[in-house]
From Swiss-Prot:
Pfam families: Ribosomal_L29. One of its GO terms (cellular component) is ribonucleoprotein complex. The lineage of its organism: Bacteria, Pseudomonadati, Pseudomonadota, Gammaproteobacteria, Candidatus Pseudothioglobaceae. GO terms for biological process: translation. Keywords: Ribonucleoprotein, Ribosomal protein. GO terms for molecular function: structural constituent of ribosome. Belongs to the universal ribosomal protein uL29 family. Gene3D superfamilies: 1.10.287.310. It comes from Vesicomyosocius okutanii subsp. Calyptogena okutanii (strain HA). This is Large ribosomal subunit protein uL29. InterPro entries: Ribosomal_uL29, Ribosomal_uL29_sf. Transmembrane segments: none annotated.
């Protein structure tokens, strides 16, 4: 999702997305450790999305 679209979301919606992404990131890490993950860029992309959402949540709370 684009950053502009994320900024238009409510904090509760962002928190739901954050939880979903954290679960996905955990699954990708486990797949990576067990050598089942084919596309390693998924790890970086989810990590970046998590950071973007956390930043937007903090900006909205300030």
């Amino acid at each position: 999702m684009d950053v502009k679209e994320l900024r238009n979301q409510s904090v509760s919606a962002l928190n739901e997305m954050l939880i979903k992404l954290l679960k996905e990131h955990f699954e990708f890490r486990m797949q990576h450790k067990s050598s089942q993950l084919d596309n390693f860029s998924k790890l970086g992309k989810t990590k970046k999305s998590i950071a973007q959402i956390k930043t937007i949540i903090r900006q909205k709370q300030a």
